[in-house]
Amino acid sequence: MQKKLDESNRPRFHFTPEKNWMNDPNGLVFHKGEYHLFYQHNPLGNKWGHMSWGHAVSTDLLNWEHLDVAITEGADGAIFSGSAVSNGDEITAIYTRHTEANQSQCIATSKDNGRTFTKYEGNPVLDLAMADFRDPKVFRYADYWIMAVVKPHQHVCSFYRSTDLIKWEFLSEFGPTAAVGGVWECPDLFPLSYKGEEFWVLLISINPGAINNGTGTQYFIGDFDGVSFTPKYSTTDPRWLDFGRDNYAGVTFNNEPNGRRIFIGWMSNWQGAVLHPETSWTNAMTIPRILGLTKMGDEIVITQQPICEPTYEIVIDATKKHPSGLTGFVELGYNPVSKKIFINDYETDVEPINQQVHLKVIIDRTSVELYTDDGTRWITMAVFSEPKVTRELTNFG
């Protein structure tokens, strides 16, 4: 008799696979009226393996329709992370083909809005004969395509260009710099504006070696001229997209119709994903976040605002002598001594405004996302406990 698995921990409005294992978001693209979310997926079980691309679509980024596996592992190798572009009437996926000895970049094309894909017969389209060379992010720039792809152990992001997605010309490299305590993965490069001035943002995920001693995503603000990325500020100290432990491998949507830069991350980490409770599904994505820029002191920094309303809004008196916030199945709030916001043991600096700290919280059964009102500080944490434990929080302090 098949064991019935408890579904009470499944998030209500964060994306989860219909069943089996999921990790990195892949191929985020808007095409013909639908947001496409592809993702690293094991169609055969709840643990990592048999990597293929799962697939779901949405019109609002909150309600998702599960579709069949888009690109499956084959005799020639597993289907690792990558991206997708809207290319006329077609969707072209650009992904890493993985074998024990080699990682190379390949493409597959869909003529039916992502429902089926055909692998290019001439694959791979980019092969350096390296064991670790992966995670291509491709986007349109001027009249050609740009690819950002990493050499993980060298802590280098390489840039290539192409006019047809098949023949690729090497342009430049960025790195090593900033956080290099683990492998570099899942790059993304995109423009954002602040008060009419355009900047370019480069995202690099790292595992391990992030601020929380696990996985995380660092970002760089700078300029991209179609050939090379030049950081605007010193890269000695890394800048972190999230100060929690559970936001990794995040990338943004190509071809977003409203001009927004929308980010989704894997709401887990490689240290804790194996501890996921026994359910029919494994792992979730962060809430989609709209990225922007603001100025803190003399520097431009990233802001993130969720596409949904928060569960809680908290205004904390920063003049109190003791920490205050919300407590229950987790404890979160603000510590006036250290001037940090926190979820359990994860924290980050926050400067009060008019002696107040404005916090917002998104709770969805097994996850907590805490962020400042201006969106400059986020802490994301997956939390698993007994299903009957309340998800309510009460004030303390």
Question: Whereabouts are the PLM-identified features?
Answer:
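Carboxylate/His-rich catalytic cores and anion/metal-binding grooves
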Residues: 81, 90-124
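Entry beta-strands of beta-propeller and related beta-repeat scaffolds
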Residues: 34-37, 89-94, 144-147, 196-202, ...
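Accessory beta-strand-rich segments of carbohydrate-active enzymes
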Residues: 73-77, 100, 116, 146, ...
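Beta-rich accessory regions
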Residues: 1, 195, 221-397
